[in-house]
From Swiss-Prot:
GO terms for molecular function: proton-transporting ATP synthase activity, rotational mechanism. Subunit OSCP, of the mitochondrial membrane ATP synthase complex (F(1)F(0) ATP synthase or Complex V) that produces ATP from ADP in the presence of a proton gradient across the membrane which is generated by electron transport complexes of the respiratory chain. ATP synthase complex consist of a soluble F(1) head domain - the catalytic core - and a membrane F(1) domain - the membrane proton channel. These two domains are linked by a central stalk rotating inside the F(1) region and a stationary peripheral stalk. One of its GO terms (cellular component) is proton-transporting ATP synthase complex. It is found in: Mitochondrion; Mitochondrion inner membrane. HAMAP family: ATP_synth_delta_bact. Residues 1-23 form a transit peptide. In response to mitochondrial stress, the precursor protein is ubiquitinated by the SIFI complex in the cytoplasm before mitochondrial import, leading to its degradation. Within the SIFI complex, UBR4 initiates ubiquitin chain that are further elongated or branched by KCMF1. This is ATP synthase peripheral stalk subunit OSCP, mitochondrial. PROSITE patterns: ATPASE_DELTA. Belongs to the ATPase delta chain family. The modification N6-acetyllysine is found at K54, K60, K70, K73, K100, K158, K172, K176, K192. It comes from Rhinolophus ferrumequinum. A motif (SIFI-degron) lies at residues 5-23.
Length: 213
């Protein structure tokens, strides 16, 4: 039963890789469109995994692939452009068999190898993660402060930020510190950007003072 799905997935990725638009109507459309080669592979994978109800499984497997490719020995045998493609395919088959990856993930890696696109693997994984994040209703938000926030302030901040989201959206918060902003905070939520840092306020004040004097 798995062979037709894998074969279909192969055709989908090849069609996307050669910019053939017609098969797109057969795909399960992702919640967000990712452009470029990585986006095409990720979109085709999302469609195939969605049809088989294996989105979460494939996502976990891709994160594992990302970890494995950071290992020097694995990276040397797969990502090196001077190594023969047949050797890369064998290394990939050994890896996917050892890790017991699903046919979807295994086939993706083989396709990347066959098409000479293994260097695009990190980008494909990143694109798929982005699609899955939107699929879950996650809204990325980064908050930068000059010094770490205490628990009470952080909790209040989360409540305020969550209030700007709809009920089916999930806040995915990342808090960073950057002493150079001097105070206040910089917030980026979704496509919105708000700079309330002391550094920016001082710069604005400086410009106003120059105009006055």
């Amino acid at each position: 039963m798995a062979a037709p799905a894998v074969s279909g997935f192969s055709r989908q990725v090849r069609c996307f890789s050669t910019s053939v638009v017609r098969p797109f109507t057969k795909l399960v459309r992702p919640p967000v469109q990712i452009y470029g080669i990585e986006g095409r592979y990720a979109t085709a994978l999302y469609s195939a995994a969605s049809k088989q109800n294996k989105l979460e499984q494939v996502e976990k497997e891709l994160l594992r692939v990302a970890q494995l490719l950071k290992e020097p020995k694995m990276a040397a045998s797969i990502m090196n452009p001077y190594i023969k493609r047949s050797i890369k395919v064998k290394s990939l088959n050994d890896m996917t068999t050892k890790e017991k990856f699903s046919p979807l993930t295994s086939n993706l890696m083989n396709l990347l190898a066959e098409n000479g696109r293994l260097n695009n693997t990190p980008g494909v994984i990143s694109a798929f993660s982005t699609i899955m994040s939107v699929h879950r209703g996650e809204v990325p938000c980064s908050v930068t402060t000059a010094s770490p926030l205490d628990e009470a302030t952080l909790s209040e901040l989360k409540t305020v930020l969550q209030s700007f989201l709809s009920k089916n959206q999930i806040l995915k918060l990342e808090v960073k510190t950057d002493p150079s902003i001097m105070g206040g905070m910089i917030i980026r939520i979704g496509e919105k950007y708000v700079d309330m840092s002391a550094k920016t306020k001082i710069q604005k004040l400086s410009r106003v003072m120059r105009e006055v004097f």
